[in-house]
């Protein structure tokens, strides 16, 4: 009996390994053939993701032209990325099909799904010749869609060039800060300060946050940069997609300027992945890889002024190269998000939240 038990255990292990490695053995041809049997790609994301319905229509047409498919993107606006990640985990654990065939999120969101073993394993760089290994932020699970360096944004009509900050530290420099004292906008989030502690350490960040609050004039969310453009606030301490904001507003004549806060720049890497239990898994895998093509990146640039620094010829790639700007390695923040939140980390975030509230 023991002999048979060992045999079936070994057989089960082989079957499990075969299933686990199935997607790694796929070829692009076999994926395209399988994808042609699926009629639509269900995508739930923010309302204006990838340019909203106009941008998604262009992506749909370009996708079908490249792969010879007749795919339709069934798009629905959904909750924020944290809520969508949590929903997928709940769906998978309960054995249900997931509500979106693909998931878009930054390091923190994808790390949550990775920790829960909720993502399909796909050998993207092995299957698709245009996908390089470094594009797989979580190897075999996620692929970079666009790069979002953080930074300061300010109104150049209100902040003289000789008084403009060159980094985060300048914001609280007594020689420069009188220019924006009492008028500085601060984002109401602790995440950017928590990530800054990976470079500066917790005590320096807490001291910095206190100094920011002392000269602040209000709070602005990352979607409210128009209030800097209008002059209501001359400057904002951090904006999560600073370069994209600058590239969106400057062609309209707005005096919005973005400045890196630290070097290398603290950066959000927005990646696509395929959650387990996807209804249309083959179209999903193709779409994740497709978003790194030049034609897909051109659509992102057209509608969102966003692109990947790892795709040759994109606005982001050229800007960083021409200005000799280095972005923070993904592994730095990924390591932070992959760790289970310990008591010290939670306490630090609570302290930051209290500081930002002025309490």
Indicate where each model-derived feature is located:
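C-terminal segment of classical bacterial N-terminal signal peptides
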Residues: 15-23
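Extracytoplasmic "Venus flytrap"
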Residues: 26-28, 38-56, 270
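Extracytoplasmic ligand-binding site segments that recognize negatively charged/polar headgroups
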Residues: 44-61, 73-89, 96-233, 246
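Conserved C-terminal helix/tail region of periplasmic/extracytoplasmic solute-binding proteins
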Residues: 328-359
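Bacterial N-terminal signal peptides that target proteins for export
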Residues: 1-10
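Immediate post-signal peptide segment of exported/extracytoplasmic ligand-binding proteins
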Residues: 24-43, 64-65, 69-70, 177-181
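Extracytoplasmic/periplasmic substrate-binding proteins
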Residues: 200-205, 215-277, 312-324
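Mature extracytoplasmic/periplasmic domains
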Residues: 266, 270-335
């Amino acid at each position: 009996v023991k002999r048979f038990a060992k045999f079936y255990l070994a057989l089960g292990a082989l079957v499990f390994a075969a299933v686990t490695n199935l997607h790694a053995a796929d070829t692009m041809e076999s994926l395209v053939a399988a994808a042609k049997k699926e009629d639509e790609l269900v995508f739930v994301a923010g309302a204006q993701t990838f340019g909203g319905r106009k941008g998604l229509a262009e992506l749909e047409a370009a996708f079908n032209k490249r792969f010879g498919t007749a795919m339709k993107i069934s798009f629905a606006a959904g909750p924020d990325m944290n809520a969508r990640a949590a929903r997928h985990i709940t769906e998978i654990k309960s054995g249900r099909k997931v509500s979106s065939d693909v998931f878009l999120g930054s390091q923190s969101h994808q790390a949550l799904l990775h920790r829960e073993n909720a993502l399909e394993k796909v050998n993207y760089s092995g299957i698709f010749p245009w996908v390089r290994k470094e594009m797989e932020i979580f190897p075999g699970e996620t692929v970079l869609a666009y790069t979002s360096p953080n930074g300061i944004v300010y109104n150049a009509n209100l902040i003289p060039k000789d008084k403009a900050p060159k980094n985060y530290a300048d914001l609280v420099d007594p020689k420069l800060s009188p220019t924006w004292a009492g008028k500085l906008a601060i984002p109401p989030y602790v995440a950017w300060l928590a990530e800054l502690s990976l470079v500066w350490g917790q005590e320096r960040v807490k001291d910095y946050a206190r100094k920011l609050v002392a000269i602040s004039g209000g709070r602005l969310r990352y979607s409210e940069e128009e209030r800097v453009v209008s002059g209501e606030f001359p400057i904002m301490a951090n904006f999560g997609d600073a370069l994209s904001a600058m590239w969106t507003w400057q062609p309209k004549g707005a005096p919005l300027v973005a400045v890196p806060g630290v070097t290398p720049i603290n950066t959000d890497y927005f990646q696509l992945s395929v959650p387990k239990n996807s209804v249309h898994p083959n179209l999903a895998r193709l779409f994740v890889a497709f978003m790194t093509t030049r034609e897909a990146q051109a659509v992102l640039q057209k509608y969102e002024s966003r692109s990947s620094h790892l795709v040759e010829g994109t606005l982001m790639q050229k800007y960083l190269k021409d200005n000799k700007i280095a972005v923070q390695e993904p592994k730095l923040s990924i390591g932070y998000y992959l760790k289970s939140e310990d008591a010290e980390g939670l306490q630090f975030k609570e302290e930051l939240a209290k500081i930002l509230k002025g309490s």
